Structure formats: C-alpha cells, structure tokens
Amino acid sequence: MAFLLHQARFFTTVNHLRDLPPTVQPEVAFAGRSNAGKSTAINVLCNQKRLAFASKTPGRTQHINYFSVGPAAEPVAHLVDLPGYGYAEVPGAAKAHWEQLLSSYLQTRPQLCGMILMMDARRPLTELDRRMIEWFAPTGKPIHSLLTKCDKLTRQESINALRATQKSLDAYRDAGYAGKLTVQLFSALKRTGLDDAHALIESWVRPAAADEDRAAVAE
C-alpha cells in the first residue's frame, strides 16, 4: 500500500516565529518529550532512516523542522517536527525560548490542522505532556497521541496504559475541549500501529480523499 507520508523530504528549519514559511498547505505538528522516540517515529512513518535526526544530547534541538509530503513539485502538506521538551539539563533561557516558540506556534498557526503527541507508553501524560494539550486546546483542532515504545510492555500492560490514557483524555473533553482527543499504541521497532497512524494523518491533510476511501469501502 502506498502512503502519502512515504513521499517526504526535508523542507526548512526555523528558530523563530517570524521565520515560519509562508506556505498554504496543511501542517501536522509532532510533539513529545526528548526521550519519547519522536524522531524515530517520524522516520518509520515516512519509511526513511535519516529524515528526522535525534540529537545525541537530548534536549539540544531548539528549532522547528519542516518536512514536505507529496509530490516534490506540488507538496500536499507539511510535517512539523517540534523541539523535544522536558530534558532537565537544558538551560533556563533555552527552556523559556522553547515554551514561547511551541505555545505561540500551536496557538496561532492557521495552517496547523492537528497535533501528534508522542508519549512513552510507560510514562504517558506527564505534566509537560498535559501542558502541550492545554496550549493546543483553545484551537479546537484534533490531538492524536501515540503511546510509543509499547513493545517494552506486556500485552496487558499495553492495554492498561491505553485505557488509562484514554480515560485521562476524556476528562479534557468533559471539561469542554472541542477538538478530538484520540490515542493508540505505537512501536517503531515492531511497526505496531503504523497503518492506523498513516490513515489518521492522511485524513487530516486530505479529508476529501479520506471520505472517498471510506465511501469506496462502504460500497
């Protein structure tokens, strides 16, 4: 099966909101703690080994990386790799810069159509993960959480983590959050959850095509 994300390439890097590209294509943000396996997940989703780079020193990446997907001449969308957060040894000034960059981007970027939140299945919904959700909540746009590294849990532990996370996310909906909050298990190593993640992201950036696919299946 061909996936849109398999047609991905590096587009640009920015370190300030003023440098965000004046593109019109929909954007999907990828967020997560520095050790949540975000870069690895992006590479597996895009079927590439070195598209997104993980810093050898967690927390050192301070910029936003853009990857275009679809035909090179006419990109369909952009994947936006946000700086990893939560690493204790990062200087305070850098943390403040990240927080301003992340919160402003998530709250004000009109092209942004949804956020993929990467969380280690063994430690989901940390305080900083919740902060990301709360920054994004006012937009009413969807958040889909990937519980990464689920291969490190037993089957029952994975099920328990999934249920507990969904219950916690439901509390945001009950509190009035308008956007969809969904979650799934994901393992880059075992390739668990790849098809589901592909389908969801493509439904965000190409909703008309997704509707056609569902109609074809129904027939």
From Swiss-Prot:
Keywords: Cell cycle, Cell division, GTP-binding, Magnesium, Metal-binding, Nucleotide-binding, Septation
A GO term from the CC aspect: cytosol
Presence of keyword Disulfide bond: no
Classification via PROSITE patterns: G_ENGB
BP GO terms, sorted: division septum assembly
Tree of life domain: Bacteria
Gene Ontology MF term list: GTP binding; metal ion binding
Cross-referenced SUPFAM superfamilies: P-loop containing nucleoside triphosphate hydrolases (SSF52540)
Positions bound to Mg(2+): 39, 61
InterPro entries named among the record's database cross-references: G_ENGB_dom, GTP-bd, GTP-bd_ribosome_bio_YsxC, P-loop_NTPase
UniProt domain EngB-type G: residue ranges: 24-207
Residues where GTP binds: 32-39, 59-63, 81-84, 148-151, 185-188
Cofactor(s) this protein cannot do without: Mg(2+)
PANTHER family reported for this sequence: ENGB-TYPE G DOMAIN-CONTAINING PROTEIN, MSS1/TRME-RELATED GTP-BINDING PROTEIN
Role of this protein: Necessary for normal cell division and for the maintenance of normal septation.
Protein name per the record: Probable GTP-binding protein EngB
Organism of origin: Burkholderia mallei (strain ATCC 23344)
Gene name, Swiss-Prot/TrEMBL: engB
